[in-house]
């Protein structure tokens, strides 16, 4: 955890369009029946940019096009995103369509194609309706920015938009970091579809931004799970356009920890919003592991627990079945000494010294009825700490995914 003064960072009611020099739009172009389905984020000038991508062998066409754009100069000025269609597993035609989305967006803005990132989310294995995309890009050119339109345009089975914003003080200058995300099902990212877009007006060194994003993604977006599946389209992208006018940030700068903490808060906030909005979910589950052999092992254990379908269903059924947590810990391949492990729920110790502990089933059940549930695990193997987030598994999840294409 990055430690900085709370006075230097504050959360605001802003969005991905709040940092200086950005605007965001969303329109309905016909990929979905009636809801918005095409969005764009635009920076007033080229922004230093970084991204992390899905580790799936079946990377979607837009991922490949965005990687190519960033490889050229590590700068972007826009990102175009469609929902309802992932443009994944669509062969050469899918790649051509992604390039065409990039070209049309660049022409609309009067910029080079390499300054545009492309992202898609939705059904896998169907070709994009480029007639609708072309119409949508024309609509974006004519449409005025409106709060929440971009965030709505990138949703699929999500039930709510996901956005956040923080303000920081860097060298006496106000710096803003905003973010938007989508994700509800198929969430088990290892950089689901899980998409995250972060904007900042900070001036920052390219390599420092990429390293920070990679490190922070590992403890935020990569620590959430809804159903254990990794998508073909997962991506987290950050743009930094320098409009705040701060002294250029790098890893040795005295205010680097402040910026890095702000970025971590934005990514963690978005990750938790995704976990909370898991398909059919009624509860956010947080698992905190302390005393593991290393931070990595703590993260592995936490994610193993929160990803267990048995744990998820127990939480849904308000059943303090700690045996399911033990099973997940034992299956994590981390260093485990059973006699040292302690499991706590709602302030009650359920398991310690490799044996059950007396606890109130009634109090545990009442605690599990909350919309947020925290499971604490103490390993006593070292100093490692890790947290993961997920949601309960309900009948509604099966219902949603049984009829996803109908």
From Swiss-Prot:
Question: Catalysed reaction(s)?
Answer: N(2)-acetyl-L-ornithine + L-glutamate = N-acetyl-L-glutamate + L-ornithine; L-glutamate + acetyl-CoA = N-acetyl-L-glutamate + CoA + H(+)
Instruction: Report the GO molecular function annotations.
Output: glutamate N-acetyltransferase activity; L-glutamate N-acetyltransferase activity
A GO cellular component annotation here is: cytoplasm
Q: Where in the cell is it found?
A: Cytoplasm
Name the record gives this protein: Arginine biosynthesis bifunctional protein ArgJ
Q: Which Pfam families match?
A: ArgJ
Q: Which family does the entry's similarity section mention?
A: Belongs to the ArgJ family.
Enzyme Commission code: 2.3.1.35, 2.3.1.1
Function of the protein:
Catalyzes two activities which are involved in the cyclic version of arginine biosynthesis: the synthesis of N-acetylglutamate from glutamate and acetyl-CoA as the acetyl donor, and of ornithine by transacetylation between N(2)-acetylornithine and glutamate.
Q: Where is the active site?
A: 193 (nucleophile)
Organism for this UniProt entry: Bacillus licheniformis (strain ATCC 14580 / DSM 13 / JCM 2505 / CCUG 7422 / NBRC 12200 / NCIMB 9375 / NCTC 10341 / NRRL NRS-1264 / Gibson 46)
Q: Name one GO biological process term.
A: L-arginine biosynthetic process
In terms of InterPro entries, this protein maps to: Arg_biosynth_ArgJ, ArgJ-like_dom_sf, ArgJ_beta_C
């Amino acid at each position: 955890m990055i430690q900085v003064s709370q006075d230097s960072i504050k959360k605001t009611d802003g969005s991905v369009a709040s940092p200086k020099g950005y605007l965001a739009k969303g329109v309905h172009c016909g990929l979905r029946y009636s809801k918005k389905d095409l969005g764009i984020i635009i920076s007033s000038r080229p922004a230093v940019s970084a991204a992390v991508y899905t580790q799936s062998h079946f990377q979607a066409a837009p991922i490949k096009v965005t990687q190519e754009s960033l490889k050229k100069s590590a700068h972007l000025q826009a990102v175009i995103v469609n929902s309802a269609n992932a443009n994944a597993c669509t062969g050469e035609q899918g790649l051509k369509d992604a390039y065409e989305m990039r070209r049309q967006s660049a022409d609309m803005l009067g910029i080079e194609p390499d300054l545009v990132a492309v992202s898609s989310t939705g059904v896998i294995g169907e070709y994009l309706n480029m007639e609708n995309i072309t119409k949508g890009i024309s609509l974006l050119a004519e449409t005025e920015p409106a709060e929440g339109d971009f965030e709505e345009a990138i949703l699929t089975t999500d039930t709510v938009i996901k956005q956040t914003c923080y303000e920081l003080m860097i060298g006496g200058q106000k710096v803003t970091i905003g973010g938007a995300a989508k994700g509800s099902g198929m969430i088990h990212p290892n950089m689901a579809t899980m998409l995250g877009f972060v904007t900042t007006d900070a001036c920052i060194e390219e390599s420092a931004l990429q390293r920070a994003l990679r490190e922070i993604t590992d403890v935020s977006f990569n620590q959430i799970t809804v159903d254990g599946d990794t998508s073909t389209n997962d991506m987290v992208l950050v743009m930094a356009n320098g409009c705040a006018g701060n002294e250029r940030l790098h890893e040795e700068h005295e205010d680097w920890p402040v910026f890095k903490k702000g970025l971590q808060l934005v990514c963690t906030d978005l990750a938790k919003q995704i976990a909370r909005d898991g398909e059919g979910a009624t509860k956010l589950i947080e698992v905190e592991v302390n005393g593991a052999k290393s931070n990595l092992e703590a993260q592995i254990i936490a994610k193993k627990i929160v990803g267990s379908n048995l744990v998820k269903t127990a939480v849904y059924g308000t059943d303090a079945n700690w045996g399911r947590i033990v099973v997940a810990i034992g299956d994590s391949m981390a260093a485990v000494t059973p006699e040292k492990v302690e499991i706590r729920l709602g302030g009650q110790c359920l398991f310690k010294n490799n044996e059950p502990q007396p606890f109130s089933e009634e109090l545990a059940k009442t605690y599990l009825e909350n919309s947020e549930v925290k499971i604490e695990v103490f390993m006593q193997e070292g100093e490692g700490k890790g947290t993961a987030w997920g949601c309960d598994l309900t009948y509604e999840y099966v219902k949603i995914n049984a009829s996803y294409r109908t």
